[in-house]
Amino acid sequence: RDRVYIDGPYGLFSHLRFSEAQEFIMIAGGIGITPMLSMLRYMADSGDQRKLTLLWSNQTPDHIVLPDAFEKLAAQLKGLRILHVMTRASEYSGERRRLDRPKLKRLLSDCSRSAAVLVCGPDQMMTDVYLWLVSLGFQRRMIFIERFSL
């Protein structure tokens, strides 16, 4: 007989820490979408009408989890804009290849530099995105990164 221990959740990765923010940007890499989905559901359930940008990087469209859930959220959250970037999808007609500073600058060009930014994904992606965001004028105190690797 096996035993399973469940512990947590831990940490403070939440949009609620930025209650004064008028705009949110969520940047996720792969399964880093998990906490973003939870926050978006909370925002939808509470009738949040702030401007939201979700930038989600995946290898291919087949790696997009729960597409129906995101369509439903987009219908509920009128301020939500979902941007996909595919890193390994040569046939994909949208944004392709890994995120880099020029792509991030272009994709977030209409976002306020005082927006709250939440980032979750692979370590190197989060490090790079943080540095690019700061270099693009986003406020350090408004950028929050969730590291989930050990």
Q: Language-model features: where?
A:
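FNR/FR-type flavoprotein reductase catalytic core
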Residues: 1-150
